[in-house]
Each structure stands twice: as C-alpha cells, then as structure tokens.
C-alpha cells in the first residue's frame, strides 16, 4: 500500500475516531417526556437574607395564596400579566415563537405563576435593616394596587403602590421596550419621623427543573451570570449541590461584584436575567431551597438610607425572552434595541448565548452566517455560502496538501522500486523512503491537513446550529423546514411518496431508515474517495468501501443544516482536489476507480500508467 493511501486511511480513521468521541462525550439529548411535573406548591421564593443591621426574622410562608387582580402585558412580542400579589412578573409568553413548526401550535410560554406546575417568575422587593422588620417592607406576599389603569405596553408603563401604614409608601414603575427588556424603578417615600434603612433586591425563581430540560453535555441549561468580567455557568444539578450557607438559610453561592454584572436562568433558546444598575457594587446569589425544590438567582443592591421627608429610587432591568443575537448584542453595546437616552450598556451580555469551548470560532462563524442569511434571505443558502467562504479561507493550506498528494503520486514508481530493492528489510525501506521524500521535498503527512482543518470548524458549526435561536425552525427548500433538526424524510416511506408515515424520530427504525440528506452525504463521501484507487490490501479496501456508509448512518441524525454543510464541503473538496491534481500532471481516473469498485477483481495496470491516472501500480510477480 502506498503512503498516500496510508495517509488517507489515517485521516479517515481519525475523523471516525473524532465522531465516536463526539458521540461518547455528546450523546443525543434525552427525549423530552411529559412525565410528572414538579408538584405545584404554594411556597414562593425565599426572601434574601437580612442586611448586617437587620433582624433575622424569616419571611412568613404563604400557605394559601388568594386570587389577586392582574395587570395585562401586551407588546408586539410579548403577552401575559403581572400579579398584584407581590407585583410578580409571572405570566409571560413569546408571540413570535411557536412550540412546533405548526403555525397553529401554542406560542412559547416563558413564565408561569405559583400554583401551576414548574412555576417560574420574577419578583422584586426590599430587605429591611435597622429598626425595620419584614412586615414593614413589600415582599413576595404583598398585595399591590395599580395607580391608574391600563395594560403594560411599549411606551405605556404601569405603576404599582403599597403603603405600609407606618409612614412608608412604596412605588414600583414597570416599563417594557419593543423586545424583551423590562425596566423596574422602585421608589420609597419616607413620611415617618425617622430615617430608615433598606436594600432593594430582585429574584428569579424556578420551582423544580424545567419540564423540557435536555440534559445535553454540549448545552448549558441552568444559572448563567457575570460579575466583574467573569462569566459563571452552573447547571441545575450543580446548584442543588451547593454548600449550605447559614446566613442564607439555604444552599447558596454568594458573589460580590464591584462594577458590573447580571444573573439569571438560561434555557436552550430562552432566558430570564436580572440586570442591576451597572457601574455600582451589588451581590449576586445562586440559591437552592431543597425542601421546596426551588432554584433562585438573586441580585442585591447597596443599602439605602432614606431621611424623613425624603424619597429614594433604585432602577434595575429584567430580560425575559428569546436569546436573539442581534437583540442581545444591542443590549450589550447600546443598552437598548433603539437609540434611547440614558440606556446603560450591559457588559458581556452576548456571552449569555452558550458559545461553548470553541467560542473563538463559534462567535465569528455565527456572525458571518447571520450576515449571509440577512443578505440572502435563506438560512440553508447562507450555510452553503459560508461553506464556500470557509473553503476559500483554508485554500492555501489545502492547495499545499493537494499538491503534495499529486507529487506523492509521481513518486509511486520510485517507491515501488524501493520496495523491490528493500524486500523484507523494513528499516532500509523506511530510511530510503525518508531520503527520497527529503530529496523530492515531499511531505507524506500533508494529505491529512484538509480533514484535520475541518474538524474544529465542524464542531463549531454544530454548536452554532444547535444553540442559536436563529437556526430554530429555519427552513431551506422542499421538505427541510427546520435546519436545526434532523432530516425528517425517510427511505422507509420512500421519502414521503408512500402513504404510510415515517418512523418516529429517536426510534431504532428511524436510525436505520435515514432521510435523503444523509444519503447524499454518503454518496458525496464515496465520490470523493474515487479520486484515488482502492488500496491493494483487501482489509484496507473493505474499510474504504464501508467508511462513507458508516458515516452516513452516524451523521444521519445530526441537524440537517450541519449535514448540508458537510455535503457541500465534500463537493468543494472533490472539485479542488481534482483541479489541483490535474494541474500538476496527475489525472485521477474517477470513472475507472468507480468501475473498479464494482468489480470483484479490479484489473491491474502498468506502474507507469498508475502514476498518471490514479490506478494502483501492478506488482511484479517473482519468477
């Protein structure tokens, strides 16, 4: 077997190994089941711990929450309501996103109130200090009153008010932009005869793990936060393993930030995040209450002293919506999606999208892909265009590799002569081969470069397609309605021509009866192999023969956008290699190699011809 075939087998085997490691490290996500939801409990989030001078009286539990009035939320992108009990933002759905591809399916619900399975909500309040007690400040069970009337909408804020009956009047003004950012201004007016001290807080609470938790290694789901430039990600299982902190009365992690930051819960596509005023110290808390199975993310801001007759105000923000790249980036860079006076940028907010280990590749790859999609108007065509750009970027390295492959073919007659002279002396053969390579300035390992280069690109593109919402339900053409999902077609029903349904995704039948796109992938890999003749060794020839079809089944249930990339990449590689090798005097006999692959006994060809047409040189028989 010549060194070129050795290199090709090595590169192919390495790719196979990488895919196997990928399946081991990143197994397919567990099927989302509609199992028993977390038992609905009337207990709400645990109030923050007292400030240093505050009493340590615990917030009273709310065993029976009364029905309270609600204020509607209605914007171009959001609908829901705010509960007057605690002023909680606990009912929110995303108008622009449906649960399935069916436009008649339910829209995605992000937040839900206590009393429903897996309650998920945000609330704000004040922690008392000094002589104040928890009964003197608004908390999770305070019944607020709306000042005025009307729903919360863009440019239509709502104002809530609560009087503690002891001279303190609390006001909360909530506004929302045309995307997913809420602004919350908390005001306390001191009409008592003495100064008071208190500290504002915000809480995002989840009762139990999400029903649609994917538990996928490549995806982060759980708490995500940033404090003074450091990003932290904590999965739900790790939150439940946090050490007990006596002062918090729960398992917790407490981080003191001096300059900027944010914290909240992230899902694959959605996020709810507390954003305190930037440029000022605050405390970030991740908490788990095991008895109630409540996960919490909190922000606590600095202690405020309000003199008699004075008023204090603290503003913060809450992001609750889809992790759209353009929207998140606008909040990071400008503080708003539209030019807004006084809007504070949110440092590092783009990192709330899970870019993964290869962030230095995934970020620029997605930026270019997003731009191409904006220019072309079709995500599938954008992936194809991105593939061409990536291949052009690595063309200089690929060119050297293909030139080296062509020159290796030119050396085959000399290598055959070396094998004849060396006989069974492997040391002599190796030494003479190295001398020949050095003399002819040929690198026998250069043929591996094209495959090695595309491995990190493949992983990065997989990450981009898997986690970015811009790929969710993004169509291509024909039957490919969602490039973030596997090809829905199946050979089982002749790609939809037969009157019976395709196998259910995730079943063994679906693994066997793959779709049209994976089959095209296998054909493209098989065609790429035909640039070179099959190895003379039967075992190696069998490996080559089976490799494209093994990859076809292994990658058949990856996202169709990724399979599309691989097909186009294979076709471009085939064209590049063919043109470059011909320009250097080597003429691959593609049709001859295809014909030979269907023959039981491929015909041997003279050694001189083999160097030019891609056929393996015939071995001389000993007399």
UniProtKB/Swiss-Prot annotation:
Domain of life: Bacteria
A cellular-component GO term for this protein: plasma membrane
InterPro entries, alphabetized: Membr_insert_YidC, Membr_insert_YidC_N, YidC/ALB3/OXA1/COX18, YidC/Oxa/ALB_C, YidC_ALB_C, YidC_periplasmic_sf
Transmembrane segments: 8-28, 379-399, 449-469, 507-527, 543-563
Region (Disordered): 33-64, 601-623
Membrane topology listed for this record: Multi-pass membrane protein
GO terms for biological process, alphabetical: protein insertion into membrane; protein transport
This protein's UniProt keywords: Cell inner membrane, Cell membrane, Chaperone, Membrane, Protein transport, Transmembrane, Transmembrane helix, Transport
Biased composition (Low complexity): 44-62, 601-617
Location of this chain's protein in the cell: Cell inner membrane
Gene Ontology molecular functions: membrane insertase activity
Cited Gene3D superfamilies: 2.70.98.90
Entry function: Required for the insertion and/or proper folding and/or complex formation of integral membrane proteins into the membrane. Involved in integration of membrane proteins that insert both dependently and independently of the Sec translocase complex, as well as at least some lipoproteins. Aids folding of multispanning membrane proteins.
HAMAP family the record matches: YidC_type1
Subunit details: Interacts with the Sec translocase complex via SecD. Specifically interacts with transmembrane segments of nascent integral membrane proteins during membrane integration.
Record family assignment: Belongs to the OXA1/ALB3/YidC family. Type 1 subfamily.
Protein name: Membrane protein insertase YidC
Gene: yidC
């Amino acid at each position: 077997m010549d060194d070129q075939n050795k290199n090709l087998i090595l590169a192919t085997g390495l790719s196979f190994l990488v895919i196997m490691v990928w399946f081991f490290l990143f197994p397919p996500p567990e099927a989302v089941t509609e199992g028993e939801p977390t038992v609905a409990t009337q207990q709400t989030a645990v109030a923050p711990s007292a400030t240093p001078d505050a009493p340590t009286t615990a917030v009273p539990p709310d065993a029976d929450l009364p029905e309270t009035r609600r204020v509607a939320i209605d914007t171009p992108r959001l609908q829901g309501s705010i509960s007057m009990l605690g002023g909680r933002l606990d009912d929110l759905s995303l108008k622009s996103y449906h649960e399935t591809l069916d436009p008649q399916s339910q829209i995605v619900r992000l937040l839900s109130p206590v009393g429903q399975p897996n309650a998920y909500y945000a609330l704000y309040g004040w922690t008392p200090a000094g002589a104040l007690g928890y009964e003197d400040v608004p908390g999770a069970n305070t019944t607020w009153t709306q000042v005025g009337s009307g729903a919360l909408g863009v440019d239509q804020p709502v104002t809530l008010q609560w009087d503690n009956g002891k001279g303190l009047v609390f006001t909360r003004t909530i506004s929302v932009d045309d995307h997913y950012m809420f602004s919350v201004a908390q005001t306390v007016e001191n009409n008592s005869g003495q100064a008071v001290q208190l500290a504002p807080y915000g809480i995002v609470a989840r009762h139990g793990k999400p029903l649609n938790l994917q538990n996928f290694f490549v995806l982060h789901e759980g708490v995500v936060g940033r404090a003074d430039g450091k990003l932290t990600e904590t999965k739900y299982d790790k939150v439940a393993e946090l050490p007990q902190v006596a002062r918090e009365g729960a398992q917790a992690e407490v981080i003191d930030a001096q300059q900027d930051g944010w914290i909240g819960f992230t899902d694959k596509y959605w996020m709810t995040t507390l954003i305190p005023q930037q440029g000022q110290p605050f405390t970030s808390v991740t908490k788990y209450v095991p008895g109630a199975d409540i996960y919490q993310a909190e922000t606590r801001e600095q202690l405020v002293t309000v003199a008699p007759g004075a008023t204090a105000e603290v503003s913060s923000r809450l992001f609750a919506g889809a992790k759209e790249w353009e929207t998140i980036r606008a909040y990071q860079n400008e503080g708003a999606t539209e030019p807004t006076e006084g809007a504070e940028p949110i440092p590092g907010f783009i990192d709330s999208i899970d870019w993964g280990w290869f962030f230095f590749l995934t970020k620029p790859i997605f930026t270019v892909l997003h731009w191409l999609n904006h220019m072309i108007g079709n995500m599938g065509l954008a992936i194809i265009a991105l593939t061409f750009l990536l291949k052009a970027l690595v063309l200089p390295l690929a060119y050297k590799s293909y030139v080296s492959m062509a020159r290796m073919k030119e050396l085959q007659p000399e290598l055959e002569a070396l094998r004849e002279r060396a006989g069974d002396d492997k040391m002599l053969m190796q030494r003479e081969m190295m001398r020949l390579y050095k003399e002819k300035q040929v690198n026998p390992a250069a043929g591996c470069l094209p495959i090695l280069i595309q491995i990190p690109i493949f992983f990065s593109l997989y990450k981009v397609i898997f986690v970015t919402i811009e790929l969710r339900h993004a169509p291509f053409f024909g039957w490919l309605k969602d490039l973030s999902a596997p090809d829905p077609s199946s050979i089982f029903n002749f790609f939809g021509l037969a009157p019976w349904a395709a196998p259910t995704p995730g079943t063994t039948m679906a693994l066997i009866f793959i779709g049209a796109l994976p089959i095209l992938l296998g054909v493209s890999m098989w065609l790429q192999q035909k640039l070179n003749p099959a190895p003379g060794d039967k075992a190696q020839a069998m490996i080559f023969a089976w490799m494209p079809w093994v990859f076809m089944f292994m990658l058949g249930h990856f996202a169709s956008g990724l399979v599309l990339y691989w097909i186009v990449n294979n076709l471009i590689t085939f064209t590049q290699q063919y043109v470059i090798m011909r320009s250097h005097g080597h003429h691959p006999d593609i049709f001859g190699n295809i014909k030979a692959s269907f023959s039981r006994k491929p015909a041997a060809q003279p050694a001189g011809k083999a160097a030019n047409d891609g056929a393996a040189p015939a071995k001389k028989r000993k007399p």
